[in-house]
């Protein structure tokens, strides 16, 4: 009688498709996956402990290095937590500038994520190059505003580092003229490719009940059919005054996660249009009076207490929990990283599929190991 034997194979920690040092222990029967266990920690850098021995503002550059694609969003989440803890208000103009930067970040992230996944799937470099083209234009805007293309360190407690330079909005408008055609072109490349459809439709399905049980958030959750978005569930900044839709999927497979990200780029475009229209009517302001004595005391000292702030980052719900003992350093600093939590159902999503599908399913989650391991 013919018998088969289960085999354990390792994918990673050094593997081009994991986009970082990440290991998967895969148990297979032939080519079919029976079990998959993700192994994290190879990029652990002690982020939270470093923040607990640093002043509050010294932690801001560290957040840039959590998810290096989304440094503006990371800055935003920490700024909200400290402002909540210290009772700091933010001028309306700074709020709109923050939203503008985060939505540009969302377009940058999703264009890169979809492009990288297509490239991993089989050398489809054309969509990747299209995504990189738009990403470069957005990075030019970031450099114009903050002086850095990636690790921007642009947000401050009570606002942003500086106002937008005069040439920023004209260059942003020029970028936005080409975005609708880019979205359509990007989507057409996906929908009309038979190979891509065969690799993504009904692959890596994450049922909504399983997604909720794992506390998944972001595009991965919405692709499973749950319309949860922190910008709507608990509006922060000026999102409560902006008009945008929350796209959701119906199946929760890799293909749905593709389409959700493309539609979210369109919604970010809508938000940017509204922000550009309202910015001329806003005024900036000086740093909040609550921070007036910081120069004398050398560092911000929030009153004793705790605060949790969360945002809808491009990868999901990003949260910062801070505990203050009244000193210039946080007593406790905790990060809720969406990449880490969204990665936990990977085994359930891969079970029953082929080994070749692991790369596709992992890429559709969109993780950055700096945020996973911290």
Curated annotation (Swiss-Prot):
InterPro entries on file:
NADH_Q_OxRdtase_suD, NDH1_su_D/H, NiFe-Hase_large
| Catalytic activity of the protein | a quinone + NADH + 5 H(+)(in) = a quinol + NAD(+) + 4 H(+)(out)
Q: Name the UniProt key words of this record, in alphabetical order.
A: Cell membrane, Membrane, NAD, Quinone, Translocase, Transport, Ubiquinone
Which terms in the GO cellular component ontology are assigned? plasma membrane
- Show the Pfam families listed in the entry: Complex1_49kDa
Q: Which is one GO molecular function term here? A: NADH:ubiquinone reductase (non-electrogenic) activity
What is the uppermost EC class here?
translocase
- Which Gene3D superfamilies would you find in this protein's record? Cytochrome-c3 Hydrogenase, chain B (1.10.645.10)
- Where does the protein principally reside? membrane
Subcellular location per UniProt equals: Cell membrane
EC identifiers of the protein:
7.1.1.-
Per the record's keyword annotation, is Cell membrane included, yes or no? yes
How would you describe this protein's topology in the membrane?
Peripheral membrane protein
Please state which protein family the record places this protein in. Belongs to the complex I 49 kDa subunit family.
Write out the function statement from the record: NDH-1 shuttles electrons from NADH, via FMN and iron-sulfur (Fe-S) centers, to quinones in the respiratory chain. The immediate electron acceptor for the enzyme in this species is believed to be ubiquinone. Couples the redox reaction to proton translocation (for every two electrons transferred, four hydrogen ions are translocated across the cytoplasmic membrane), and thus conserves the redox energy in a proton gradient.
PANTHER family, per the entry: NADH DEHYDROGENASE [UBIQUINONE] IRON-SULFUR PROTEIN 2, MITOCHONDRIAL, NADH-UBIQUINONE OXIDOREDUCTASE 49 KDA SUBUNIT
Subunit: NDH-1 is composed of 14 different subunits. Subunits NuoB, C, D, E, F, and G constitute the peripheral sector of the complex.
For this entry, the protein name equals NADH-quinone oxidoreductase subunit D 2
The organism encoding this protein is Roseiflexus castenholzii (strain DSM 13941 / HLO8)
- Gene for this protein? nuoD2
